Regions:
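Extended, low-complexity, intrinsically disordered C-terminal regulatory tails
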Residues: 101-132, 210-240
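Acidic/His-rich structured neighborhood in mature extracellular/periplasmic domains
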Residues: 125-176
Length: 260
């Protein structure tokens, strides 16, 4: 910048009354601004994504395969993929139609919850199969969603940048995170997110087959205004889970999508 100002001054006086060369110089400087470097996740996306493919999911969510997978984008206007480490290890591949469902739902949420950034968590490997330590996620139709959070009535993202370790966060049965100074689950935003996902699934010819959220948190979810609407839809929420599976679904909710 220290050298640009003197150069512009010389050009200005050299141009005299003819302003056109000066305007061209300014426009050239404006258009030649250096773009910020792409993130590692964006570079990975650019290299591996194949949006034109139509995916085929075979088998079950716990014993399945995925062909022609597409890669979920690392970020958008109101969402991010939660972990660079997970993304670069190829754990964000998805069935192409499920990707459409997610993007349609997130687009609608821009208007429904305009002040909320959502976090997409792990999905599947490029060819499906085991995604350790998950018991499912094997055919690109299972998706984990980070639970939206709040503190003192306001949106809070203080725990959202933990990456993979977010899976190890714990809440009490009222949705308050341990050692967080009062950060808690935003159940209203959670319900709105699931409603949007359900609507997008239906419009794309799919449905939500199952939602997994810690059972002790369901009452607080269904008490919210949007939670009451969610309960009326009779979407299946798992009510019988092993202790281990139940306990690990307090920082996120899991959805299995199924084509109608």
């Amino acid at each position: 910048m220290r050298y640009i100002i003197p150069v512009l001054s010389i050009l200005f006086f050299a141009c005299g009354e003819n302003k056109e060369p000066m305007i061209e110089v300014l426009q050239s400087i404006e258009t030649s601004k250096i773009e910020p470097p792409k993130s590692l996740m964006q570079l990975y996306y650019d290299k591996h994504n194949q949006d034109s493919l139509y995916s085929i999911s075979k088998g079950t969510v716990s014993n399945g395969k995925l062909s022609n997978a597409v890669l979920f984008p690392p970020k958008g206007n109101n969402y991010n993929y939660f972990s660079e480490q997970s993304y670069l290890k190829g754990r964000a591949f998805v069935n192409s139609e499920v990707k459409d469902i997610l993007l349609d739902a997130l687009a609608s949420l821009e208007n429904i919850v305009p002040n909320q950034q959502f976090q997409i968590m792990e999905i599947a490997h490029e060819h499906g199969g085991e995604l350790w330590p998950h018991r499912t996620h094997q055919k690109g139709t299972s998706v984990d969603f980070m639970l939206p959070k709040m503190k003192e009535g306001k949106v809070d993202y203080s725990l959202d940048q933990k990456g993979i370790s977010h899976y190890f966060l714990n809440t009490n049965n009222n949705g308050v995170y341990d050692d967080s100074d009062g950060v808690k689950i935003n159940f209203e935003s959670t319900a709105k997110e699931i409603l949007a996902l359900n609507k997008a699934a239906i419009l794309n010819g799919w449905k939500i087959k199952k939602v997994i959220l810690k059972i002790e948190l369901l009452d607080d979810l269904f008490k919210t205004p949007s939670g009451k609407k969610l309960k009326q839809l009779k979407i299946y929420f798992a009510k019988s889970l092993t202790k281990k599976v139940n306990e690990v679904h307090d920082d996120h909710f899991h959805i299995d999508f199924e084509k109608k």
